[in-house]
Amino acid sequence: MQHTFTLAAWNFRLARRSLLALWGVFAAQQAAVILWRAAQPGAAGLGLASHYYATMQIFAWLGFYLLTALAAGAATHNSRRARSGYTWATLPGTPGQKLAAKAVTIAAAELVFAAWQLVWYIVEFYPVTALEGWHRRQLYGAVLPAANLYEQVVANNLFARLLPRRPAQLVILLGILALSAAMLAALDTVRGWRKLPVFAGGLFCAWVCFGIVGIEQHLEWLLDEPRYAFRIAAAAVLAVLTVWWAVRSIRRGEAA
């Protein structure tokens, strides 16, 4: 286990520059579109959560979430290890440890990106509030009370899903994190035509995860509706087979 985390830390170190650049682009585009909307005359009093929703930043976040995982996985490729003289074949550890280290790297990058979004959202709150206060002063001749930061975080459509409020929600989020990291690590590991079935399996697992998030507040439906339990079981079996196939690719020297 210690070797796996050591290798994951090395992977993260190789990926840090590309990840920082990617997160910088994400922060810049989000600040640009949200501040632009907050500067419009009709935006007075709407609040940061409303601007976040109207500019579809939840979809931008999902896109950059995927790019974060791909960038973290790309750091493990042989081309990035050339300077140290290591390749997938010569790295110490078993094939399972190598794939697990890649999955841990991806999961860590995804967690840091989620935390970065929360921090950046807090940073954006203050200039957006100032702009809206200026608009209200122009319209009404006085600054009306604005929603505080806590209210804007609670009202945000992304944080309503990412910040767990119940134990079941925390378990679901951790399960989705582990599943996404494992599937994306496998997708990044296999080469050639093997990527197609892994990609298709990843799409199915993503569809199942979105469905689980949608019924998270009504988990009793899993017992009342057998189709939900069947989909979850199918996704779990598919994930296990995909991980096995990726480990087999590393063992046979077919990894990227």
Which functions belong to the PLM regions below?
Residues M1-G85, P95-A256:
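Hydrophobic alpha-helical transmembrane segments of membrane proteins
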Residues T90-T94:
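Short helix-to-coil transition segments within interhelical loops
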